[in-house]
């Protein structure tokens, strides 16, 4: 039995459940190593089952150990029969399912108690093992190189879409399987929109260019943002940039095992507030990354939780002034017992090209 399944069973026992159905495909992969568009896991103390369909049966047999593997069209009926034959009664399920899927569960598991579970596997995924960390580090190195290469590509007259496409294609050329998310590429006043979509707008001298991008490598993601300037930079632009950079670096300097979620957000936010730009920092400081681009933990001013060694988090302060421009700097960091390790290594000093 692998360590992830054992941790799953320990948590399941704490919740007094006889078994749990997992149908989130990334959680299925996390537990089994199986990657496909159809897969449902059922884990109980005595049996661990993966149900897929005939398209994936060969792959599942090759990729998965420690699970019984079934190819069935009705995965819930298959799992329900197993649960009932075992005499189980209290069955957990992931609560982010459609209404129709829930109705199917009610029919299949009639007579058994169905107990919704929130972020059951996602909570286990917060702490990365050495293999996961190495994979994320590789994804980050691809993003770093793509950014470096983009600096030579960007010229006045290139459009936001052309630059975004360059980043996307370059990451694939460097070994990425795909993108973590649709690349955000915003220049000039568009950079004041934190999640702007790239447009057919040419970049112009004197503009800020914000690039938020990442790639997939062996199913794990990177997530990096850099802001650069084309031709020249004003005093106000430089002041705002250096304020964001100071906030970003302050969190890198202080993030470590045991730091409270509230402080993780407060440390960089206080710097931006003290500089007079607090109202222009309009989003959270960061989130976890891994199999998903946004995953646990998320940070709240009211949370009493603490960050832990093995978490991989984003550090992404920003300032956005409507109608003018914006700045965001984002890094991926690995939390350790004594501090944090910076995984995104692309330069962050104020760059003018």
What are these regions, as identified by a protein language model?
Residues 1-353:
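Active-site neighborhoods and metal-handling regions in enzymes and metal-associated proteins
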């Amino acid at each position: 039995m692998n360590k992830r399944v054992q941790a799953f069973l320990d948590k399941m026992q704490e919740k007094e459940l006889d078994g749990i159905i997992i149908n989130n495909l990334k959680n299925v992969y996390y537990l089994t190593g199986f990657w496909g568009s159809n897969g449902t896991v059922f884990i109980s103390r005595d049996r661990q089952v993966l149900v897929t369909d005939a398209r994936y049966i060969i792959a599942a047999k090759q990729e998965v150990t420690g699970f019984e593997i079934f190819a069935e069209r009705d995965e819930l009926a298959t799992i329900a029969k197993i649960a009932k034959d075992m005499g189980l009664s209290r069955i957990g399920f992931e609560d982010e399912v459609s209404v129709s899927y829930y109705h199917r569960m009610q029919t299949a598991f009639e007579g058994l108690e169905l107990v919704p579970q929130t972020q059951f596997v996602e909570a286990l995924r917060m702490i990365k093992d050495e293999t996961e960390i190495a994979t994320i580090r590789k994804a980050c190195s691809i993003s770093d190189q793509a950014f470096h290469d983009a600096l030579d590509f960007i010229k006045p007259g290139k459009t936001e879409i052309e630059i975004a496409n360059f980043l996307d294609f370059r990451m694939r050329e460097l070994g990425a399987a795909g993108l973590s998310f649709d690349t955000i590429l915003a220049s000039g006043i568009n950079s004041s929109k934190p999640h702007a979509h790239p447009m057919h707008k040419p970049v112009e001298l004197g503009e800020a260019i914000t690039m938020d991008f990442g790639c997939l490598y062996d199913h794990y993601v990177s997530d990096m943002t850099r802001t650069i300037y084309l031709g020249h930079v004003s005093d106000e632009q430089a002041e705002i940039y250096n304020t964001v950079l100071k906030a970003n670096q302050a969190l890198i300097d202080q993030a470590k095992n045991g730091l409270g979620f509230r402080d993780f957000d407060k440390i960089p936010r206080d710097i931006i507030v003290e500089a007079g730009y607090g109202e222009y920092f309009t989003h959270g400081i960061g989130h976890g990354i891994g199999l998903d681009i946004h995953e646990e933990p998320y940070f709240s001013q009211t949370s009493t939780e603490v960050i832990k060694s093995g978490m991989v988090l984003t550090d992404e302060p920003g300032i956005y002034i409507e109608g003018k421009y914006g700045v965001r700097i984002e890094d991926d960091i690995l939390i350790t017992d004594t501090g944090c390790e910076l995984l995104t290594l692309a330069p962050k000093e104020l760059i003018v090209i």
